[in-house]
Amino acid sequence: MSGGLEVLSMKEDDVTKLLAAGTHLGDSNVDIQMAQYVFKTKGDGVPIINVRKTWEKLLLAARVIAAIENPADVCVLANKPFGQRAILKFAHYTGAFPIAGRFTPGTFTNQIQKAFREPRLLIVSDARSDHQPITEAAYVNIPVIAFCNTNSPLRYIDVAIPCNNMGKNSLGLMWWLLCREVLRLRGTISRELPWEVMPDLFFYRDPEEVEKEEQAKAEAERERLATDQWQTNQPAAPQQDPDQWADTMGVPSGGDWGDEPVTTAPVPTGGAPPVASTTATPATNTGSGFNQDDWSVPTTKTKDWGADDGGEWGNTEPKASTGNW
């Protein structure tokens, strides 16, 4: 289908994405109607889907979706958890109506119930697990587009897109490619520029992993806020001018440490400056502080410890006792 137009041909980047996601790997069981999409079988019995036929069916499905005037008349459905996030993203960008999770029987056939809808086109993620909406769509003549694996039955399916719909990366990539092609056919995005939306947004994510990532981000944010608050509350060290510091310590600015501070007496108005006295007043003990007399030479002569009035130790004789013991 896309061999005649260069614009619709499959690019190398698209082939790399399909092979990296494992879209070409089918199920070990092959339905007789899906055998036409199998390229060959590996030695371990796994069939390999022809990627070129996958791309051609993808373009056909995108043309069918773009032909619907009202995007809300397109219903996308996924019963498996792997495709629920993908259909929600597809509905967000294309304007389709999503049904994620369990399909309520009678949604397309029972007009009494509140959830009754009449879509013009139905797109399902798995032809085997979504058999109930496919059957109801056949009752009311709603065309069906389905992502089919090699073991999927093709009954009541109008456009089958062969791919690996069992892997979360493969199914998310197929929804991303279909969404991009629909937007290109509508003229919303250009073919010359890459789409800014990454395929990772269409991939399934485990709720437990998402919760752990959110907790880790919240913990990191709390630590960052605590660090910023601690740094904000710390007072800055006062920076004092060196000249002011020298004045408070009694050291002249720009002088040596050994120089004594010079104090200038105030000059009385209208007279000569006072003459400083040249006679030094001896320091006296005022009861506290330094006393010069403590360091002066004593005026009285003191005796040695061993000296006696009688002379040396050896020349002294004991005095005779004058009385009895």
Curated annotation (Swiss-Prot):
Gene3D superfamilies tied to this protein: Glucose-6-phosphate isomerase like protein, domain 1
Pfam families the UniProt entry points to: 40S_SA_C (PF16122), Ribosomal_S2 (PF00318)
InterPro entries according to UniProt: Ribosomal_uS2, Ribosomal_uS2_C, Ribosomal_uS2_CS, Ribosomal_uS2_euk, Ribosomal_uS2_euk/arc, Ribosomal_uS2_flav_dom_sf
Biased composition (Low complexity): 234-247, 261-289
CDD domains linked: RPS2 (cd01425)
Main location, first listed in the record: cytoplasm
Superkingdom of origin organism: Eukaryota
Polar residues biased stretches: 290-300
Protease in keyword set: no
Alphabetical UniProt keywords: Cytoplasm, Ribonucleoprotein, Ribosomal protein
Residue ranges with Basic and acidic residues bias: 212-226
Localization annotation: Cytoplasm
Region feature (Disordered): 212-325
Record's GO cellular component terms: cytosolic small ribosomal subunit
GO biological process annotation, one example: ribosomal small subunit assembly
One of the record's GO molecular function terms: structural constituent of ribosome
Record's function text: Required for the assembly and/or stability of the 40S ribosomal subunit. Required for the processing of the 20S rRNA-precursor to mature 18S rRNA in a late step of the maturation of 40S ribosomal subunits.
Family the entry assigns: Belongs to the universal ribosomal protein uS2 family.
Subunit structure: Component of the small ribosomal subunit. Mature ribosomes consist of a small (40S) and a large (60S) subunit. The 40S subunit contains about 33 different proteins and 1 molecule of RNA (18S). The 60S subunit contains about 49 different proteins and 3 molecules of RNA (28S, 5.8S and 5S). Interacts with ribosomal protein S21.
Protein's name in the database: Small ribosomal subunit protein uS2
Naturally occurring in which organism (per UniProt): Suberites domuncula
